[in-house]
Amino acid sequence: MKTEKKNINIQIGKRLRTARQNSGYTQEAFAEALDVGVEHYRKLESGIYGLQPEKMLLLYEKYKIDPTYLITGDKNHAFDIELFAFGIGMKWV
């Protein structure tokens, strides 16, 4: 189970890096948007740390980075922010 979670974090981190680079932003900009230090952000991209759903919503809100893409790698769907927020117990306004 621990290995599976680590592999998921690595895959999400790779997609996070790709999305950031494709958007033309620096690690510093994404770290600031997530309210974490640059070193912490680097660990998110490398998969050492897992990206929390609440942080995914912040990236969506600021940069339109699709949380479903980060989780699954699927780019071909309609993302529903309200449903995602509801699923993690947050209210989206």
Walk through the language-model features, giving the residues of each.
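A short, Lys/Arg-rich alpha-helix, primarily the initiator
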Residues: 1-22
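Helix-turn-helix DNA-binding elements, focusing on the entry/boundary residues of the two helices
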Residues: 16, 27, 53-56
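Residues in the recognition helix of alpha-helical DNA-binding motifs
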Residues: 19, 33, 44, 73
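Flexible coil/turn residues that form the inter-helical turn or adjacent wing/linker of helix-turn-helix
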Residues: 12, 23, 37, 52
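DNA major-groove recognition helix of helix-turn-helix/homeodomain DNA-binding modules
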Residues: 54-69
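Short alpha-helical DNA-recognition segment
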Residues: 24-43, 58, 62
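Short, charged recognition helix plus adjacent turn
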Residues: 1-2, 61, 71-93
